[in-house]
């Protein structure tokens, strides 16, 4: 476990690498991965994490796909980090699958927008943009050795066809988070607060 340190409430944090975040989104949108076929997305995220030095033991996939009606290539991807300081565990998540029309997407930049070079495909921004946000956040924390509470990064499968990845995720694997942040659609000014039970 990482040594615990006090968090300086006045600490200045570096600006995130937004250029890399956009590059990650572009790369992720180009990877085919409709519901049930997210294996290449898992491979990309896992490879990126290992290259950045995330310990292999912190990177896991579950067997949710074996419980999902119709199966699938792979289960959910989960990364857990011990905190550098005390605090409630936080979970950051974005689903990996896209709807079928996004398979074959060829994203390209046009000014300050991202469009598909193939008008017959969607971009897959839902939710590959969210995957890029969660991945870039993890990379920033690890590479810059930023202080953080215990964290769980969760990329579920098969959201588009019934929230199946999240539904069949073994909760123990997520580390009992007290707060969750889900990057999936909606206006930036909209925050949904919910509780189970």
Residues covered by each model-derived region:
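Short, acidic Gly/Pro/Ser/Thr-rich loop/turn segments
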Residues: 36, 86-87, 99-101, 161, ...
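N-terminal capping segment at the start of a domain
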Residues: 2-39
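Catalytic-core environment of secreted peptidases
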Residues: 77-125
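Buried hydrophobic positions in well-ordered alpha/beta secondary-structure cores of metabolic enzymes
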Residues: 32, 49, 79, 92-95, ...
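General structural feature for long, well-ordered alpha-helical segments within catalytic domains
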Residues: 17-24, 37-45, 75, 88, ...
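General beta-strand structural signal in soluble alpha/beta enzymes
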Residues: 58-62, 92-94, 115-117, 153-155, ...
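A non-catalytic alpha/beta surface segment that caps or lines the substrate-entry region
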Residues: 34-84
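Acidic/histidine-rich catalytic neighborhood of metal-dependent amide-processing enzymes
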Residues: 119-197
């Amino acid at each position: 476990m990482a040594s615990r340190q006090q968090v300086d409430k006045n600490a200045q944090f570096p600006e995130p690498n937004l250029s890399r975040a956009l590059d990650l989104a572009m790369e992720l949108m180009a990877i085919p991965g409709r519901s049930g076929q997210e294996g290449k997305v898992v491979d990309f995220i896992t490879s990126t994490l290992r290259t950045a030095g995330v310990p292999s033991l912190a990177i896991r996939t579950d067997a949710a796909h074996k419980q999902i009606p119709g199966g699938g290539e792979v289960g959910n991807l989960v990364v857990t980090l011990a905190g550098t300081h005390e605090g409630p565990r936080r979970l950051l998540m974005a689903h990996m699958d896209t709807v079928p029309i996004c398979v074959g997407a060829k994203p390209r930049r046009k000014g300050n927008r991202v469009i598909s070079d193939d008008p017959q495909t969607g971009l897959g921004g839902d939710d590959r943009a969210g995957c890029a946000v969660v991945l870039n956040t993890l990379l920033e924390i690890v590479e810059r050795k930023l202080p953080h509470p215990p964290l769980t990064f969760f990329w579920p499968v098969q959201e588009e066809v019934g929230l199946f990845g999240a539904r069949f995720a073994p909760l123990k694997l997520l580390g009992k988070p007290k707060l969750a942040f889900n990057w999936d659609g909606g206006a930036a000014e909209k925050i949904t607060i919910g509780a189970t039970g």
